[in-house]
């Protein structure tokens, strides 16, 4: 919020302390990156022909357009660590505030320089090419109006331990201190997690024409029976999630208006399901729905893509696609969504 810049030269990215803790070609150690449950990159491993590690914290920003996708990078936690076994020192770096703007980058020596390093890069102002008119092929570069109303902060945790498991314990301790609800839970308190799928799209032929309609997988009555059977089996702590229960199913229409799926049963059947879960001790029922995306834009459903859909910087609608893993292009067999 306090960054100033010339409007003719907007700040697109910010790289904070890129070489803090960097090691040279003579030192031994490794970096921890948020790949899966924690990936390990050894210093000076000689793999100079491979690309540097780069991953978006929490995944791609869908407000940015893309025409192809080769690799979907996604980090589920905003952490990187550097452990120097030569100096017997290490630190963890956690992106706290503004982590959703961050990208994790790490690389070894022997490529652009002689250092092994890891850093966070923050995308501040997004820009895209916009066509000036349909009568010419001239494009201009447009940017967002200003910086996001956000504060960027990074927390460093220093240690003299360099073992992978010790660094994992350091991060666990940090999380338990920041989020007390993540404390130890006894085995007798562990809940059984159950997800039930209500309705999905299926193609039916009516008078010879293919029509996409909702197909019932787990009706309201069947969902209640499943929970009853689990309760009778002696499972007293259940967290149940019911997905695809309204607005045509899993690939639903806008949640601005809620309508039950006729093929799953009546509204009273759904009320019986929720009432049973409410009166049963140790049972939690979560009616799951999608509120960030609209898979089907129908008339009078409370949503208009031209009016309500998110827009790219180029002022075009944010249309999202399913990607073909072979061609890396948008898969035309599936409809786009917003």
Question: Residue spans of the language-model regions?
Answer:
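Carbohydrate-recognition beta-sandwich/jelly-roll modules
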Residues: 1-217, 224-233, 237-238
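Aromatic-lined carbohydrate-binding/catalytic grooves of carbohydrate-active enzymes
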Residues: 187-275, 280-283, 287-337
